[in-house]
């Protein structure tokens, strides 16, 4: 039995330490927004934040998380109204939607590190998150729209 700090709360989980974090999040904790895509950490659909860093949860053992805070798409904003989530809806980014939680989680770290991202910044940080529907131009536009809203919120 170990404790997992997820989305601001502590959850006791009884799993082997080598169990992928993805399956603990989905099957044990019951948060299904994080998706299984490839199982080898190459597509980004399973991206969550561990200690504030984007992490591929399908290849991260729950034992490797330790006491770090895990944030999933459900924890990005308690009401689902993070500027990225609003921009995704406003610009109708998803087609099938399967990769989108991972895209948004990666983009959240991008905007933390690059509050005014260039196309080059976006492409560089988002390159490992694959979208089989090829909505990359809408993703870029949504990231830029969210960046504007986040700067406006920061400036009051």
List where the protein language model places each region.
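Signature of N-terminal electron-transfer/Fe-S-associated modules in redox systems
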Residues: 1-156
């Amino acid at each position: 039995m170990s404790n997992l700090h997820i989305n601001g709360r502590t959850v006791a989980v009884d799993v082997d330490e080598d169990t992928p974090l993805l399956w603990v999040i989905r099957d044990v904790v019951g948060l299904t927004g994080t998706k299984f895509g490839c199982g080898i950490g190459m597509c980004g659909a399973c991206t969550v934040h561990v200690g504030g860093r984007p992490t591929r949860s399908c290849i991260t053992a729950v034992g490797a998380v330790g006491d770090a805070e895990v944030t999933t798409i459900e924890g990005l904003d308690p009401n689902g109204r993070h500027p990225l989530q609003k921009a995704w809806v406003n610009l109708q980014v998803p087609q099938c939607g399967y990769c989108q939680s991972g895209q948004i989680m990666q983009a959240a770290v991008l905007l933390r590190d690059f509050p005014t991202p260039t196309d080059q910044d976006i492409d560089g940080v988002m390159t490992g998150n694959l979208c089989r529907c090829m909505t990359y131009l809408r993703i870029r536009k949504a990231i830029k729209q969210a960046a504007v809203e986040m700067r406006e919120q920061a400036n009051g």
